[in-house]
Amino acid sequence: MSEELLQKEVSVPSISMMEQDAIGEVLNISMGSSATAVSSLLDRQVNISTPSVSVREFHTLDYSAMEPALIVKIEYVEGISGNNVMVFRQRDIQIILNLLMGNDDPPSDDFEFDELSMSAACEVMNQMMGAAATALSEFLNRVVNISTPTASIVTSEDSYRDAIGVQEGDEIVAVSF
């Protein structure tokens, strides 16, 4: 599965390689917990790859392979500030939803999100991000709480920008797994 996690860093225009490595390590720990949570939900082994961290202007990201996609965004409401945005290809979310329903069918080209599938996807992401927040809490030795996830379907760079809440020229820390 292809997924990309974006974290907007408003006050820090650039970060050092050591800071990028630290972000990658922390996210590897927290996303490892997320993968475990999804493994439990799906009753399947879920693995994540080693994260790749970069600082870039939002408009330089190429989302063409991710369209259409589901974006799930959470905000940190306690312990740390910022937000996380997970971007999933529609095909990957369909696989997750099929497995949740005990269905091993391959993804369908005519799949469209409806209210039920969006709600189910948000609940899966809530479980993932809740597990990640718990791992961050343990790592940082402080309480880390998140908002309820919000989800958006995106089909273009403009809809990505609107869903994530960035402006033209904003720098983000992009982490790909």
Language model feature labels by segment:
Residues 2-177:
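Composition-driven recognition of glycine/serine/threonine/acidic- and proline-rich low-complexity segments
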